[in-house]
Amino acid sequence: MIIETFDNTTQEVLKELEKTQKQFWNISRTTAEFLYNIIVDSKAKSVVEVGTSNGYSGIWLGKALKKTGGRLTTIEFYDKRLDVAKENFEKCGVADIIETKRGDAATILEYLPEDFKIDIAFVDANKSQYIKFFEFIKPHLNVGGYIACDNVISHAAKVQ
């Protein structure tokens, strides 16, 4: 398992965050490992996460990006969640490669600099805005890049 390759502190933080999965709407470990592998296998350098929450997925993305020499830009609307995430990024040794943005994701994505390029985008936020997020991310996506959206099947009615 990938988690066993992480330092003890990161393993402990991730296991604690897994206990709050429903409260903070975190992805499953299986999904986290899948995203980790996509980043490492594709040698992604620029990843954007929409929906930071408490940082669970961001830690996984950050650990993968440490292997590829990349950076993560993560966006969260709620102040308290982003503050918790920042603490978790520090504890897990990924804060140095993560840029956090606080605010409305659609607005932040809409006004990304024209030359901002994305290898992989992971969207796990307000389901009713997924199509809008996609439209703002697509012009920045590098050839061969990926956009992964969580809950598109389980929350299909909200995504449309």
Go through each PLM region and give its residues.
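A short alpha-helical cap/connector motif
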Residues: 1-122, 127-148, 152-160
